[in-house]
Amino acid sequence: MRILILTNADIGLYKFRKELLETLCKNNKVIAAFPRGEFTEQIKETGCKYLPFEFDRRGMNPLSDFQQMRRYIKLLRKLKPDLVLTYTIKPNVYGGLACQLLRIPYITNVTGLGTSIQNGGVLSFLTISLYKLGLRKASCVFFQNRMNQGLFLEKRIVKGRSRVIPGSGVNLENYSYQTYPKGGEGFHFLFVGRVMKDKGIEELLAASRKIHKKRKDVITDIVGWSDEDYTEELKIAEEEGAIIFHGLQSDVRPFYATCHCAVLPSYHEGTANVMLEASSTGRPVITTRVPGCQETFDESVTGYGCEVKDMISLQNAMEKMLDLSSSDREMMGKAARKKMESEYDRRLVIDAYLEEIKRTKNGSV
């Protein structure tokens, strides 16, 4: 079977779907088209063939987007895939439309709602309208949480088959349980993700600075690339000793291993992968009570929740974690690991894809 994958970047495909690629490549010819990036060579090592496909993943230029759809049509005509898998909004919409025009079956993954839908207004209306067109004939639409699925069904964006999967899951072996840190120098919170407003970076910096003023031994490690310009804010917080900014790291596992608690005050997620990784490592977590985050932890069992866009609520949750004994935090981390083993094993996601691919191949659409 010839399978084509359309996505907007290599990082998500490699970090969260590498095992799926490896599984698919065993019995199929798999081709992936996306803009070249840092992880492209590693993706090729899975057995997947790479085709460069550059486009603006953030812009909303109608002419540029129309050209992207035309290029997808040209690509599909050339490759003649038996099935197309799409991820992220533009490949979902324009790849989906191209598949419809050429009558090629496709399976879509809605990895999150994104700001274009969350913020409402004209852009939200336009995005929903495009999604209705792009997902209209999908063999199956995967969602990463029930709230997103419910919204798409309520607005009749999806009328056909859909199902919820546990995000991208987590590789339990790759993110193996690590002994909770004993003693050491101070207490380390850890944020892993893009440095941008929608990830809650402003609330995190403010809360970290306030806590550090009271407790000099508490530091927040920030790991990730800066999608937006927070250079000055990061510099001020780092000079105060409240944070350490590590930038983008190719391997975040050592940071999970040495932290005492992972924090993600995100405004919205499909499923918060960093919460899965931290929990799998055996660390308690703090995250917002929003779809895609709230499902990844059990309140007071594996971590604490806070209100979205609420610095005081975040600070309270962080201080609540600090007030626990080390043994209580360790117990939380062990409970978090068990939750990942039972609910978020990446093999569950792979099995769901294999089921839908088999179903599509057999014509049960």
Which ranges hold each PLM region?
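Short, structured helix-loop element that forms part of the nucleotide-activated donor/catalytic region
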Residues: 40-44, 210-213, 219-246
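A short, well-ordered alpha-helix in the C-terminal region of glycosyltransferases
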Residues: 327-343, 349-355
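Short hydrophobic beta-strand element within catalytic cores of glycosyltransferases
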Residues: 284-287, 297
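Donor nucleotide-sugar binding/catalytic pocket of nucleotide-sugar-dependent glycosyltransferases
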Residues: 51, 132, 136-177
